[in-house]
Amino acid sequence: MKNQTPLRAMLLAVCAALCVMSVSLNVHAQTAQPDDQTNLETELYLIVGTNQDVDASRLPASLESVVRQLRATLPFKNYRLAATLINRIKNEGKLELSWIGGPLASSQSGAASAVAPSFSQFKVRQVKLVRNTENQQVVQMLGFNFGARIPIQTSGAIAASGAGVPAFNYESTGLSTDISMRESEPVIVGTLSVGPSGDAIILVVSAKRTQK
């Protein structure tokens, strides 16, 4: 009987330890933060400002405030929407896009050439919801990066048939920054000068939470 007493005590101690561990695991499971399933919708607009006599496309109504700001600060005769990119990103996620599009700059003749495309890339290292110094919730984009390779017409080469063929050189342009914005409020990120005609690419971005 004396030998059974220490064994019984040891078994009771093991059972007590297991009970404490089980309670601890249950409490941890109840207090652990659930995975954030919030998604954000980002919209990137590429607007081209030019003084050339080109057909200016109508800009979306959501960009009216941006257009007023552009006309007040940038002395371009015409503005056209070159691209609209809409993407869905998980909160605290990243985004990376590459695409081939139409010309972003006008040729010296005043018309955008359809012969040579533009190559563009858009990256954001992290998109997340944060609180600003006034405790307002805003969307923060860390590592915002836009880059493009723009075809610039240099001369008109002569083909074997005797017809003129335009010659192009590709020039790189881009912008990198960190920005914050209110939800659903388009903001101008920056402008990039392109081409000998003095055209400019205006980067506008907005972001908002989406329904699950």
Over which residues does each language-model region extend?
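Outer membrane pore-forming secretion/assembly proteins and partners of Gram-negative envelopes
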Residues: 2, 29-212
